[in-house]
């Protein structure tokens, strides 16, 4: 076996158990790559790929979840010393909850032969991920049941995440829309059942095809759902995504490490600084930055505030989709109280872009404790009222209990995380399982449900808010003293008070805030327990002022893909409650 060292570490670390297991089975057939994030990473030959993936899926403590699957265009990458020759790389990020560990499998491909076998027979959620890779890179997955575009229209030309594809609007011919082009684009939106393997009629009846969206209040965003109906029963359904796609991963390749922060806020546009956290942490790991305890605590406190604002909106719209109009207005009032605190601390409400590489944009303002304490005194009583007045309502329970139900095994197979997974009885919360940002120092519980239905998913979200309130109170009571930003040359922006010392400090400050810092070459993934599930940023640095490749893994993408397996055979009304219960934001799905 050849071992590749990409990022040297002075400390000798034990060989991960999964590497030993692979060595016993495939000695000499794979290459180990060391990464900053310490996730075991191995390169395998394309011919061995499915065998290796199946082996990992069937280990005694198996890697049951395909957490992520994507690709990297390696053709312009300069700093990849020792790695196997590759024009394009397809990677598989696998997760084992029993081991509480991950493994990353990579396959090298040449530009002349962009083919790799499909993994849909091993993990059903590979379907959408492989379609996305084809859409963005043009890599073909042989054996895929329906390899078509997923984020872009089917008439789109080119594959945007290839390096030769332009990244700026000024590099394209100016866009225009005349009547003929509009009609062409509209015609391409026509749903043709045969293209999806659907029949227009059954043995004794004709099916009806119903479009919900892309502009529909129950779609929770620009999203189209096509239902194949036999009366009120859903025979099959096709979630049609991509209407909110903005090319966030492509944008990351043309923004400095610092200037990409505002874009992260707009992935899950309800998550605020929670979106910034995995990106910032990945960059900090690459740079070797250790942030001060005060910055850690501030980050945790503000992240939990956004968890509360997200969950309040979720619960309100959940009840609204079931027919209860009143609670959502009360919950908007409560969200306003939370946003008053957020705005006082960060200067903005929903998209503060406030975390910085190395810490936060500034320190907490004077009087922040009073604002936080007032919110903590207000919110618990309100949650009690919502549970008593709305969530224990017999009509709501009748609409949601036993509806859109799935078990833990199904959730893991489809890559479901967050409240959707915990509602099946599995108490997996990354803040407990793999503490980050000092979460191991906080006293809080992991709410779980046991029925895996729409009602349990909602109640888990309610209990999450109670735990967030506990965490925020501990942050307030135990806020450390000290700096709010690391004293590190790659922290951005550098301290302003040092810029006037001499010409060198002034030049360094100018370069940092204009061109941006140069981050060390390497790869790093950071996963956080975000508002809707597990969110990760996998960053590849080529020792430049901008990211070479930024992969954004979002929970909504995985959760929507599961929909047909849950809803087929149910009623149209159940499909609406399923969408209401999985907490989707289409910007989070489409990126």
Curated annotation (Swiss-Prot):
Subcellular location: Cell inner membrane
Source species, domain of life: Bacteria
Catalytic activity: a quinone + NADH + 5 H(+)(in) = a quinol + NAD(+) + 4 H(+)(out)
Principal EC category: translocase
Gene Ontology MF, one: NADH:ubiquinone reductase (non-electrogenic) activity
Gene3D superfamilies reported for this sequence: Cytochrome-c3 Hydrogenase, chain B (1.10.645.10), NADH:ubiquinone oxidoreductase, 30kDa subunit (3.30.460.80)
Enzyme Commission designation: 7.1.1.-
Region (NADH dehydrogenase I subunit D): 206-591
The protein's name in its UniProt record: NADH-quinone oxidoreductase subunit C/D
Organism name: Psychrobacter cryohalolentis (strain ATCC BAA-1226 / DSM 17306 / VKM B-2378 / K5)
């Amino acid at each position: 076996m050849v071992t590749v060292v990409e990022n040297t570490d002075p400390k000798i670390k034990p060989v991960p158990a999964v590497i030993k297991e692979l060595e016993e089975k495939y000695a000499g057939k794979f290459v180990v790559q060391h990464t900053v994030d310490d996730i075991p990473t191995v390169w395998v030959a394309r011919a061995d790929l499915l065998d290796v993936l199946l082996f990992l899926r069937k280990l005694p403590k198996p890697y049951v979840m395909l957490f992520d699957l994507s690709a990297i265009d390696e053709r312009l990458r300069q700093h990849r010393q020792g790695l196997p020759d590759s024009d394009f790389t397809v990677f598989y990020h696998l997760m084992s909850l029993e081991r509480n560990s991950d493994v990353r499998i990579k396959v090298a491909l040449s530009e002349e032969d962009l083919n790799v076998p499909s993994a849909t027979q091993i993990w059903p959620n590979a379907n959408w991920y492989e379609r996305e890779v084809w859409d963005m890179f043009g890599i073909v997955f042989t054996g895929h049941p329906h390899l078509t575009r997923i984020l872009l229209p089917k008439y789109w030309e080119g594959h945007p995440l290839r390096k030769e594809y332009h990244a700026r609007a000024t590099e394209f011919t100016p866009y225009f829309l005349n009547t003929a082009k509009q009609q062409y684009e509209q015609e391409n939106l026509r749903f043709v059942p045969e293209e999806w393997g659907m029949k227009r009629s059954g043995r004794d009846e004709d099916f009806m095809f119903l479009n919900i969206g892309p502009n529909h209040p129950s779609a929770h965003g620009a999203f189209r759902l096509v239902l194949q109906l036999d009366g009120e029963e859903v025979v099959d359904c096709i979630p049609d995504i991509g209407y909110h796609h903005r090319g966030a991963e492509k944008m990351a390749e043309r923004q400095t490490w610092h200037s990409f922060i505002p874009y992260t806020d707009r992935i899950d546009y309800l998550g605020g600084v929670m979106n910034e956290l995995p990106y910032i942490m990945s960059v900090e790991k690459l740079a070797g930055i250790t942030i001060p305890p005060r910055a850690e605590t501030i980050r945790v406190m503000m992240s939990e505030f956004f968890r509360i604002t997200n969950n309040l909106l979720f619960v309100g719209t959940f009840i609204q989709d079931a027919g209860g109009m009143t609670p959502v207005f009360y919950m908007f009032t409560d969200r306003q109280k939370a946003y008053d605190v957020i705005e006082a601390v960060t200067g903005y409400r929903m998209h503060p872009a406030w975390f910085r590489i190395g810490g936060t944009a500034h320190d907490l303002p004077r009087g922040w404790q009073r604002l936080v304490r007032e919110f903590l005194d207000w919110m618990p009583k309100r949650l009690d009222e919502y549970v008593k007045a709305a969530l224990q309502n017999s009509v709501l329970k009748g609409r949601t209990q036993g509806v859109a139900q799935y078990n833990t095994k199904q959730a893991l197979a489809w890559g479901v995380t967050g409240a959707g997974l915990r509602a099946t009885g599995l108490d997996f919360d990354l803040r407990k399982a793999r503490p980050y940002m000092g979460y191991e120092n906080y006293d809080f519980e992991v709410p779980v449900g046991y029925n895996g239905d729409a009602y349990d998913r909602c109640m888990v979200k309610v209990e999450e808010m109670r735990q967030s309130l506990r965490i925020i109170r501990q942050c307030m009571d135990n806020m450390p003293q000290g700096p709010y930003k690391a004293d590190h040359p790659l922290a951005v922006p550098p301290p302003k008070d040092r810029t006037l010392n001499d010409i060198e400090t002034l030049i360094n400050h100018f370069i940092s805030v204009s061109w941006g810092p140069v981050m060390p070459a390497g790869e790093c993934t950071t996963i956080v327990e975000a508002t809707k599930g597990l969110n990760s940023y996998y960053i590849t640095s080529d020792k430049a002022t901008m990211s070479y490749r930024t992969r954004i893994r979002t929970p909504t993408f995985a959760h929507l893909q599961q929909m047909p397996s849950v809803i087929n055979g149910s009623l149209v009304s159940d499909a609406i409650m399923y969408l209401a219960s999985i907490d989707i934001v289409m910007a989070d799905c489409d990126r």
